[in-house]
Amino acid sequence: MNKIKSMLSVYFIAGSQDCRHLPGEPTENLLTILQRALEAGITCFQFREKGEQSLACDLQLKRRLALKCLQLCRQFQVPFIVNDDVELALSIQADGIHVGQKDTAVETILRNTRNKPIIGLSINTLAQALANKDRQDIDYFGVGPIFPTNSKADHSPLVGMNFIRQIRQLGIDKPCVAIGGIKEESAAILRRLGADGVAVISAISHSVNIANTVKTLAQK
């Protein structure tokens, strides 16, 4: 459990669709941003190629990009997680898979894997947290969205920062990473409320100084 908690500290999520604000090719922009984030000390990366302007419809290009991201993460010994796409995760031997409440069922993932990957599950209600708190096949909860976010058009209702405290007050000790509209100034507060780490997209992908951003996000 401690290894998972450490992994969640500064959890970067991105796909090419999150890098279109920069000049040049979005896939190359993603690789550049990821390399800088790895050099700065992120503790986990989730490849999330979803939504408008993503490569979701070009499976070959998506796989090639995922492999390049995986190779970068391997160089820095940082876990590489794939968002929902079980087939992709298994074919490139990703370290883990993250799923939402409406995504691929955890049981389906386990039926298709020989060696259990790291599995993360998105949580948006206390009922969901209680229902899954004792499941050994789920390694961590992604809790949110904490704040409004533009990175996901169909996000669940906001839960707010105090939701993390409520989870801990129920005696749930499952590793938790807070997600959704998190900025640098919120990270330390969320940790004090009980989060093991923060997951961000725009805070890093839009940062003008990734090294400083990662350093601030890691502060306790």
From Swiss-Prot:
Protein residues bound to 2-[(2R,5Z)-2-carboxy-4-methylthiazol-5(2H)-ylidene]ethyl phosphate: 149-151, 181, 201-202
E.C. designation(s): 2.5.1.3
BP-aspect Gene Ontology terms: thiamine biosynthetic process; thiamine diphosphate biosynthetic process
GO cellular component: cytoplasm
Cofactor requirements of the protein: Mg(2+)
A matching Pfam family: TMP-TENI
Name this polypeptide is given: Thiamine-phosphate synthase
Origin species: Mannheimia succiniciproducens (strain KCTC 0769BP / MBEL55E)
Native organism taxonomy: Bacteria, Pseudomonadati, Pseudomonadota, Gammaproteobacteria, Pasteurellales
Gene (UniProt): thiE
